[in-house]
Amino acid sequence: MTQTIFMVGARGAGKTTVGSALALALGYQFIDTDLFMQQTTQMSVAEMVEQEGWLGFRRRESIALQTVTQPSTVVATGGGAILAEENRRFMRQHGKVIYLRSPAEVLAQRLEEYPQDTQRPTLTGRPIAEEMLEVLAAREALYQEAAHYVMDGTGGPQQVVEQILSALQLETVK
């Protein structure tokens, strides 16, 4: 299998952590679309949003997603990449989409434990626990629609990687 693997899920779901470990296990390249955009623009996500608004940021995110997609690559997407129907369709057509699903309280706890990883500005202006509840409620159906596989993201990174590898292996056997 050399298909691109796309990691989707909310902020704090572990897309970057699990995605990089998965890439290592598969011998794939790993790319995080947020980091790619930061490197190519020399701006943080917050600066991009401040300068271009969320609409401009999302447009840039769609271009980045298509730019980094290549065989034998694991791509960690931004939490909102699935908001654009074009992105959901693109990912499903060009690879396998893995949704790392975790409850809002787990996501909030992770984001509070690792505040440096929360480089995105708040979406709602509310406390992180409330924001995660609201974001998941709004996006859950879109994550599900995009996903080929829905994985429990509450375990440790290696445990989640093993679950993903098992799911992908079962598919190649069919």
From Swiss-Prot:
GO terms for cellular component: cytosol. Its main location: cytoplasm. InterPro entries: P-loop_NTPase (IPR027417), Shikimate/glucono_kinase (IPR031322), Shikimate_kinase/TSH1 (IPR000623), Shikimate_kinase_2 (IPR027544), Shikimate_kinase_CS (IPR023000). It catalyses: shikimate + ATP = 3-phosphoshikimate + ADP + H(+). Its cofactor is Mg(2+). Substrate binds at D34, R58, G79, R139. Transmembrane segments: none annotated. CDD domains: SK. Residues 112-126 are annotated as: LID domain. Its EC number is 2.7.1.71. Pathway: Metabolic intermediate biosynthesis; chorismate biosynthesis; chorismate from D-erythrose 4-phosphate and phosphoenolpyruvate: step 5/7. Binds 1 Mg(2+) ion per subunit. Monomer. This is Shikimate kinase 2. It comes from Serratia proteamaculans (strain 568). The lineage of its organism: Bacteria, Pseudomonadati, Pseudomonadota, Gammaproteobacteria, Enterobacterales. The gene is aroL.
